[in-house]
Amino acid sequence: MAMADQRNDKPGRPAAQRERRGWLSRIAPGVRNFAKRETPENLWVKCPETGEMIYRPDLEAALWVTPSGHHMRIGASQRLAVTFDDGQFEKIDCPQVVEDPHKFPDDRAYPDRLKAARKQTGEQDSIAAAYGHIRGQPAVVMVQDFAFMGGSLGMGAGEAFIAAAKEAVKRQVPLVIFTASGGARMQEGTLSLMQMARTTLALNEVKDAGLPYVVVLTDPTTGGVLASYAMLGDVHLAEPNATIGFSGRRVIEQTIRETLPPGFQKSEFLVERGMIDQVVRRADLPEVLGSVLKTLMMGRERLSPAA
């Protein structure tokens, strides 16, 4: 009987254990799910310059400038929000263009690359344009997004540039661009190279209207973009340590078979040699831009009666 009682006791213990396990199993998934919701995967960002891990909200509050002073690349929407007063602006609609006119052969179809870039950036092409106020001064601002296929210049970006230039002339306000590009978009061939000439002609209309055109060079500004509208401004500003040049450093060194000086093609190097006017920290850009634009527009108002 004693042995029988012991056998009868055994089923009771697993039942209690099952009850305890059931209680834990009910709360454990909730705790795990709560932890997942409260801890984003990209909570920490590594500084490209020093390797320091930076708390993402702190980096966003610092306008994506690391404690070491490194200016990280930011998207078009972020740039527009930071530049315009109170982050308020009106987006400028851009005409649609034919996609993949050359049926460019690649390991990944060009339309698929465009689709992925649009999903990543939320922009239609590498240039976004908007109208708003910078320290009270009305202006049309364009931003090149390097995350959109390296900020490459294609037909869509060219149309966006022209639409922005026309809007500036229509509203009689200054035109500003933040450049960031690797150059012309190879998938569009000669149609991409045509945009260098088309954007230059659009700028002629802005200048014929007596309106200022200010360029802010950000990292990196290279290739056909530098050879066209990036160097046609009335005033050229640049962010710190931005790479600015037509060809890459290694390409130049291999071509001329010489070692280039330290800091070559960096904004600080270029301002010392008179190629750009001023290097400005990102946090100070709205104030500096507002001051420059107001000064240039005051000069235009003084000249307009004589004209």
UniProtKB/Swiss-Prot annotation:
GO terms for cellular component: acetate CoA-transferase complex. Pathway: Lipid metabolism; malonyl-CoA biosynthesis; malonyl-CoA from acetyl-CoA: step 1/1. Residues 43-307 form the CoA carboxyltransferase N-terminal domain. It comes from the Bacteria. Its EC number is 2.1.3.15. SUPFAM superfamilies: ClpP/crotonase. It is found in: Cytoplasm. The keyword Transferase applies. The keyword Lipoprotein does not apply. One of its GO terms (biological process) is fatty acid biosynthetic process. Residues 1-21 are annotated as: Disordered. PROSITE patterns: COA_CT_NTER. InterPro entries: AcCoA_carboxyl_beta, Acetyl_CoA_COase_Trfase_b_su, ClpP/crotonase-like_dom_sf, COA_CT_N. It holds the Pfam family Carboxyl_trans. GO terms for molecular function: acetyl-CoA carboxylase activity; ATP binding; carboxyl- or carbamoyltransferase activity. Transmembrane segments: none annotated. It catalyses: N(6)-carboxybiotinyl-L-lysyl-[protein] + acetyl-CoA = N(6)-biotinyl-L-lysyl-[protein] + malonyl-CoA. Keywords: ATP-binding, Cytoplasm, Fatty acid biosynthesis, Fatty acid metabolism, Lipid biosynthesis, Lipid metabolism, Nucleotide-binding, Transferase. Component of the acetyl coenzyme A carboxylase (ACC) complex. Biotin carboxylase (BC) catalyzes the carboxylation of biotin on its carrier protein (BCCP) and then the CO(2) group is transferred by the transcarboxylase to acetyl-CoA to form malonyl-CoA. Acetyl-CoA carboxylase is a heterohexamer composed of biotin carboxyl carrier protein (AccB), biotin carboxylase (AccC) and two subunits each of ACCase subunit alpha (AccA) and ACCase subunit beta (AccD). NCBIfam families: accD (TIGR00515). Belongs to the AccD/PCCB family. PANTHER family: ACETYL-COENZYME A CARBOXYLASE CARBOXYL TRANSFERASE SUBUNIT BETA, CHLOROPLASTIC. This is Acetyl-coenzyme A carboxylase carboxyl transferase subunit beta. The gene is accD.
